């Protein structure tokens, strides 16, 4: 954006601020990749409500179909962003908090696989396998970054659990597809990773540097409700 003074600003001593950056592909945030996790979770819950309570199945399937399209659109946009603006993507991956959202697309792909499996098992099952493999890779890379000391205190925030929750979530879908042994393996890996990361988060909460005021309020409200 332009940073030149407008005519008359200098004479009257008015503060001059640079205009906000225009919303472009370069500024598309990585945390948006978590959106399919929310819509897909509601869709899968509605599917179960159809079996248990008899609610209309079309609502859940429509939500899941929308989730699949949303996942494709967001991943495609981020891929295009990485091609056109690699420095912007690398900057987010170096961010201590936003890097955790790099695992969101693999969880979204698990949800898409669960949506497709009843309709096209030949497609849903392989997609689950691909999602699990990629998710394990992302989770291990993130854990390596933490244990190697490159994860500063700011990294130990609630979004850090996204990569590790996915390892426990994968069996929920995998067992129904027939991947019983692989699901047990993923569950075991998820528990081990949780045991490795949870103490770090608790130490950050009780003995680490003060949390940002906004995060303090969120944790206080969540604690008050329990």
Where are these regions (language model features)?
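Structural signature of hydrophobic alpha-helical transmembrane segments
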Residues: 62-73, 122-136, 183-194
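Alpha-helical transmembrane segments in multipass membrane proteins, preferentially the mid-helix core
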Residues: 138-142, 172, 196-205
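N-terminal amphipathic/basic-hydrophobic helices that include classical n-h-c signal peptides
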Residues: 1-15
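Membrane-interface helix-loop junction between the first two transmembrane segments
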Residues: 47-59, 76-89
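Transmembrane alpha-helix boundary signature
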Residues: 78-86, 114-124, 142-148
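Helix-coil boundary and interhelical linker segments in multi-pass alpha-helical membrane proteins
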Residues: 46-59, 114-125, 170-185
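Juxtamembrane helix-loop boundaries in multi-pass membrane proteins
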Residues: 17-45, 60, 64, 85-111, ...
């Amino acid at each position: 954006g332009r940073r030149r003074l407008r005519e008359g600003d200098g004479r009257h001593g008015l503060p001059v601020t640079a205009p906000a950056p225009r919303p472009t592909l370069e500024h598309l945030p990585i945390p948006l990749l978590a959106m399919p996790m929310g819509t897909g979770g509601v869709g899968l819950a509605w599917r179960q409500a159809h079996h248990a309570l008899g609610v209309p199945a079309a609502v859940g399937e429509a939500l899941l179909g929308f989730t699949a399209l949303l996942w494709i659109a967001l991943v495609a946009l981020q891929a295009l962003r990485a091609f056109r603006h690699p420095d912007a993507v690398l900057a987010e991956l170096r961010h201590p908090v936003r890097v955790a959202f790099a695992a969101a697309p693999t969880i979204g792909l698990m949800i898409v696989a669960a949506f497709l499996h009843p309709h096209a098992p030949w497609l849903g099952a392989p997609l689950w396998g691909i999602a699990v493999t990629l998710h394990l890779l992302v989770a291990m890379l993130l854990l390596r970054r933490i244990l190697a000391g490159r994860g500063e205190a700011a990294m130990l925030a609630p979004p850090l659990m996204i990569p590790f929750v996915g390892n426990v979530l994968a069996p929920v879908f995998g067992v129904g597809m027939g991947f019983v042994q692989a699901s047990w393996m993923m569950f075991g890996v998820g528990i081990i990773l949780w045991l490795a990361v949870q103490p770090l988060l608790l130490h950050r909460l009780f003995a680490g540097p003060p949390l940002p005021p906004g995060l303090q309020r969120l944790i206080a409200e969540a604690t008050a409700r329990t």
